Amino acid sequence: KHPAKYIYRKPPALDDGWPTATLDEENIDRPAMERFIQRLIDVPQDSVNAPQHHAFLLVRHGKLVMEEYFHGYSRERLHDTRSASKSMTSVFVGAVMNDDWRLTLNSLVYQVMNGGSFPADLDPQKRTMTLEHLLTMSAGYYCDDTDDKAPGNEETMSDQTQEPDYYRYILNVPMATPPGEKSVYCSAVANLALGMAGAALHDFPLYAFDRLVAKPLRLGVYAWGLDPAGNPFGGGSVQYLPRDFIKFGQLLLDKGRWNGHQILSPEFATRSISPLYHLRKVTYGYLWWIEDLPYKKRTVRAFMALGAGGQLVMGIPELDLVIGLYAANYGTRTQGHLREVIPQFVLPAVREPGDDQNAPVIDQEYTNPYGASPDGSRVKP
């Protein structure tokens, strides 16, 4: 059987806060995008290594212009976001800061988590650890998720049974470097940022998330995982509906504002997606990845929420563009497949004012740079 020929249709306007438009109305080449979606449809599913795509959404100038689903997925079906959830944790922390003066980037982790005072005999390095260190993964814990020997490694933490409270678990992990010196990818640190926001409010984090983020963003149903002690896990695997998942990218693109609601301060939103540390051959802000992508004869800066398997929200402020992806490229499947096809096939279809509307769309060569961290150092101004 040959897959059916794809025909583009404008996304439906629903009661979820998204205005919709056509590709043509927002200056995106429709034939090029039709070829791109057909390319996704035509991927053979004859191997465990075959890329499998579940959803592709595209927003231009704040309007949803493309919404496509594959392999039985739909807009009504929740999807695991894996580590892309870390970026949503950052949004929650920023929303708490915007709502309550008691939490700042300089708030001291152990003071907040201990009810206002430091624990007795606390490691001097831990005494200086701040919320900003958690958001940039530069806390200094021995917790590298790629190091099986690290006691704060996510798998080590989730496999152990002695401490059901994951906030308390990471607080007791030894230090590897002073806070702020080096960024190391560590899910437990992102989770602790969520716990710190809840502790500052003296509230269960999910109640605060619902009030400060979910309601103003008009999120539908969503699902958070809990640790064995019943705390929400801020390091990954929150499930969102596709049209809700992509809202987080638009929120950051619009400097923390969504449909009249200032959920984040403009300063926090801007710094969240600024390159602060080198991490995995790209750069990192406040639990958001930052990378420069080829576009025409220059590069454009993109910020990204990334999750294993191909989960992605990408915003490109210079093009007023947001992209959302769900996929199942786990294990031996091509993890970075969709990240590569965006600069190859999607960005060339995006027009700017003054472009020749009849010019052919030329695919762009691109190789994903994502890989092992060379140093984890600060980005120099």
Regions found by a protein language model. Name each.
Residues 1-74, 98-103, 136, 349-381:
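N-terminal leader/targeting segments and the immediately adjacent pre-domain N-terminus
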Residues 70-74, 167-178, 223-233:
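Acidic/His metal-coordination segments adjacent to aromatic residues that form catalytic metal sites
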